[in-house]
Amino acid sequence: ALNAIMPTFLLLAFGYFLKHKNFVSSEFLKQTNTLTFKFFLPFLLFNNIYKTEITEAIDGMTFTIAVGSLLLLFAVLCVVVPRVVREPKQRGVIIQGIFRSNYVIFGVSLVTNVFGAEEAAAASILSAVLVPMYNVLAVIALTVFTGGGKVSLKKTLKSIATNPLIIAALLGVFASIIKLRFPAFLETSLRDVSRLATPLALIVLGGDFSFRKLKGNMRIAGVTVFIKLVVIPLVFLPIAVLAGSRGPSLLALALAWETPVAVSSYIMAQQAGADGELAGQLVVLSAVCCIPTVFLMIFILQSMALL
């Protein structure tokens, strides 16, 4: 478990060190983040999927649990949160903060750390389903419950259709189905480029981290992150285990519930006229708190011989 989580923590810490010691600028981090999102992460997803036998990598049960748990969680949050949160601008932010995860960066990398790149296809394929669902549900939550500005569903659907991560994952599935193979030199280049994705993504995330963003709203942010990282996995993980999920598929499911709040949730909250400050705090606090919670989760699952 320590070997799985420490590389992630060290890369985040390295990014924080580089930025706060002025070795890199905010502009550099912004440009690197764009490169990573548009090129390196798509290469990683495609490379993880296209050489995999899809039917062996992930089964219908995993998809059913992932989609079913997300929709159930969203429905419950839409009923409960408006009843217990008084501030309208915080309701949509809290809803998306609990269900929405930074799955592509943390989920795929941690499955790779535990099982190796060959077994990371389950997490990569699952991202093709979860990423568009996260975006659509976030738009609904922010539009219906915020009462401020509006997030365009049409624009969001367009962004989903042109999302490099989703396109790469779907192309990987198609390439796997037709059993596409590249010449050795292209496979080597594809592998080398894909290896840049996770380190760069985590370094950029660490560089963007600021303890100052944690000031204010700590009580409500703390409760939200606790529900996300502790309560939700405790509810859904036993269901996945009882359903027979094991190994890479189980870890991929677990990380769909356990990983930090997606960075893009902060931007969407601002666009919707919601509490952008709280959204940013949820991103930062969940990134800090996920290190021990993910470690404990992996340790417990390994101790029970489920991974």
Language model features by range: what are they?
Residues A1-L307:
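Alpha-helical transmembrane segments of multi-pass small-molecule/ion transporters
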